[in-house]
A protein has these predicted regions:
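Conserved, mostly hydrophobic/aromatic
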Residues: 21, 99, 132, 164, ...
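Glycine-rich, proline-tolerant flexible connector loops at the mouths of alpha/beta enzymes
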Residues: 30-48, 68-74, 254-261
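Catalytic alpha/beta core domains of metabolic enzymes, predominantly
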Residues: 114-247, 261-264
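Active-site-adjacent beta->alpha loops and helix N-cap segments on the catalytic face
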Residues: 41-51, 100-106, 145-157, 258-260
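Hydrophobic faces of well-ordered beta-strands that scaffold small-molecule active sites
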Residues: 8-11, 29-31, 64-68, 95-97, ...
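Conserved small/polar residues in nucleotide/adenosyl-binding loops
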Residues: 277-282
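Active-site beta->alpha loop and helix N-cap motifs at the rims of alpha/beta catalytic domains
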Residues: 47-109, 114-122
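N-terminal basic/disordered segments at the start of proteins
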Residues: 4-28
């Protein structure tokens, strides 16, 4: 039986971030090209940069996963395969997918390429995961709202690899189901153009106690951030995730700087290695 060693998966929005992730110890890097990605405002990779990145990663025995994780319109599908083909031929290790039509098209046209179900698919239970497995998916990025026990059960019941977010920003809504940006800014978060209205301050208006509609004065409270979640950090729970044999530990941040990518990746690399190769690391994990 192969010895367990969870994959550390780091983000890259630029070539400098890719190099930083590799240097800091990432086993794999996920990144987006100029099309079909859920981070339209990241640097993203041109065709030439992506091919260069694949060559660099494979030189260091690291993997590259390409994000094709947005909802796709009918007139965009025709150019999908031509866009993916050079990366597939260069040994692209996997594609992270949201759209079901994209999934089917990739499965038929690129045999042997790993297909990963994006967190944007909102996979929360085993029947959904098994359906995706029947369509060729080999790895699930489960909804970030799931508990560790739910993820563990999902893995046991499906036999699929689990890629779990361990660090970074969280959406206030279920992954892949948010329409807030579309409502307020006319920019679809499910098409890679989220305006992040949940990160903005809001003025909370109310009534003084006992005032009701008739008697009380309108009360204006200082601006607050009621919808902006704190960032995720699982370092204190890393031993439990590794005990659950999570397959891939994913850091959020394709719009972050190379310094951020390098720093966070190095920290998780250190503690993952300590847990794998020593017995006293768990006591030293505090964020």
């Amino acid at each position: 039986m192969e010895e367990y060693r969870g994959e550390l998966l780091a983000p890259a929005g630029t070539m400098d971030c890719l190099k930083a992730a590799i240097a800091a110890g990432a086993d794999a890097v996920y990144l987006g090209g100029q099309r079909f990605g859920a981070r339209a405002f990241a640097g993203n990779f041109s065709r030439e940069e992506l091919l260069e990145g694949l060559s660099l990663a494979h030189l260091w025995n690291r993997k590259i996963y390409l994000t094709v994780n947005t909802l796709t319109k009918q007139d965009e599908l025709s150019g999908l395969c031509d866009w993916i083909a050079p990366f597939y031929e260069a040994g692209l290790d996997g594609v992270i997918v949201q759209d079901m039509g994209v999934l089917e098209k990739l499965r038929k046209n690129f045999p042997g390429m790993e297909l990963h179900a994006s967190t944007q698919m909102t996979v929360t239970e085993s029947r959904s995961a098994l359906f995706l497995k029947s369509l060729g998916v080999c790895r699930i990025v489960p909804a970030r709202e799931l508990s560790l026990e739910e993820i563990r059960l999902l893995k046991e019941q499906t036999g699929l690899a689990m890629e779990v977010f361990i660090h970074g920003a969280l959406c206030y809504c279920y992954s892949g189901q948010c329409l807030f940006s579309s409502f307020l800014g006319g920019r679809s978060g499910n098409r890679g153009r989220c305006a992040q209205p949940c990160r903005q301050p809001y003025m909370v208006l109310g009534q003084e106690a006992g005032g009701g509609r008739r008697g009380g004065k309108s009360q204006q409270k200082p601006p607050a951030y009621p919808l902006s979640l704190k960032d995720l950090c699982v370092l204190p729970f890393l031993p439990e995730l590794m005990d659950a044999k999570i397959d891939s530990f994913k850091i959020e941040g394709r719009m972050k700087s190379p310094e951020y990518v390098a720093g966070v990746t190095a920290i998780y690399r250190k503690y993952m290695d300590c847990l794998l190769y020593t017995s006293d690391a768990a006591d030293d994990m505090q964020c």
